[in-house]
């Protein structure tokens, strides 16, 4: 099964579980969790079921395309179900069956790995899912989002698409994966992987990135002051990416690192609180949709 078919299979499976199928969010981020499709929508009482592929940039992990499984940018297939259904674990195992992986014929383990993202003020009970000794998925129940208690609890399933594909296709090198017939992963992503690594470690303008961080921080504050949550959150994501570039370049000391993370966390918590307040002003409209659907 090639990568494109994997994605289409997962989209079809989760669409049948009443998930909205969305596209990736168009701002750089380090994980699918950081998308507003997840981080903002898991705040407050409104129901929300969604699935999407998210390209995730981690500058420090760039290896110029020379490492077989470590990447500047990888892809996650993200699923959020809020509130978490009682059978969410069985649904996940069914999704593996849809990919041709029979849980009865493989060693599938849920290894406790409670999750925390201090930059965004998020935490939850979690497990790594191991398939025959390889981690393929992170499974998390959100307990805190943007510094706020999660109520109801959301279930997050994050498939590592590259890892899953290397297992399914029995490949050692991610760049050898078949994305679709006639095109490999390397055909599509090797050049950008090399160029982004070169930029991150050799070319990026450190002074400019420090200036951008401060500019984005101020603009996020300005947007929040006008109750504009989504524009503010875009700038918070840009702050986070600028920080990641600086961190990868070795431009931030250990002491400074803590301070920069705290600045992003402060903004994220303000955005989370503001999002809740704005949805509350609207009367939590998705609750009304759910009530109407139940009737």
Curated annotation (Swiss-Prot):
This is Glycine--tRNA ligase alpha subunit. It comes from Shouchella clausii (strain KSM-K16) (Alkalihalobacillus clausii). GO terms for molecular function: ATP binding; catalytic activity, acting on a protein; glycine-tRNA ligase activity; transferase activity. Belongs to the class-II aminoacyl-tRNA synthetase family. Keywords: Aminoacyl-tRNA synthetase, ATP-binding, Cytoplasm, Ligase, Nucleotide-binding, Protein biosynthesis. One of its GO terms (cellular component) is cytosol. Its EC number is 6.1.1.14. It is an enzyme of class 6 (ligase). One of its GO terms (biological process) is glycyl-tRNA aminoacylation. The gene is glyQ. Disulfide bonds: none annotated. It is found in: Cytoplasm. Tetramer of two alpha and two beta subunits. Pfam families: tRNA-synt_2e (PF02091). PROSITE patterns: AA_TRNA_LIGASE_II_GLYAB. SUPFAM superfamilies: Class II aaRS and biotin synthetases (SSF55681).
């Amino acid at each position: 099964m090639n990568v494109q078919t994997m994605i289409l299979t997962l989209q079809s499976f989760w669409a049948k579980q009443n998930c909205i199928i969305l596209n990736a969010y168009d701002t750089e981020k380090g994980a699918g969790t950081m998308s507003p499709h997840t981080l903002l929508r898991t705040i407050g009482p409104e129901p929300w079921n969604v699935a999407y592929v998210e390209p995730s940039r981690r500058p420090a992990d760039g290896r110029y395309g020379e490492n077989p499984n470590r990447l500047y940018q990888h892809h996650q297939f993200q699923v959020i179900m809020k509130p978490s259904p009682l059978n969410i674990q069985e649904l996940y195992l069914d999704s593996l069956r849809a990919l041709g992986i029979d849980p009865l014929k493989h060693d599938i383990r849920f290894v406790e790995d409670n999750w925390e993202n201090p930059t965004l003020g998020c935490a939850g009970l979690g497990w790594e899912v191991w398939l025959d000794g390889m981690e393929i998925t992170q499974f998390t129940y959100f307990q805190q989002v943007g510094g706020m208690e999660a109520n109801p609890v959301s279930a997050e399933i994050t498939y590592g698409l590259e890892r899953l594909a290397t297992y399914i296709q029995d490949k050692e090198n991610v760049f050898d994966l078949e994305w679709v017939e006639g095109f490999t992963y390397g055909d599509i992503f090797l050049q950008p992987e090399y160029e982004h690594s070169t930029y991150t470690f050799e070319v990026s303008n450190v002074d400019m990135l420090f200036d951008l961080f401060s500019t984005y921080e101020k603009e996020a504050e300005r947007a929040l002051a006008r109750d504009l949550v989504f524009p503010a959150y875009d700038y918070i994501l840009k702050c986070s990416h600028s920080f990641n570039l600086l961190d990868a370049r070795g431009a931030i000391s250990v002491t400074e690192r803590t301070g920069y993370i705290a600045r992003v966390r402060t903004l994220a918590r303000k955005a989370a609180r503001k999002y809740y307040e704005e949805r509350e002003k609207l009367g939590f409209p998705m609750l009304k949709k759910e009530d109407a659907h139940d009737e």
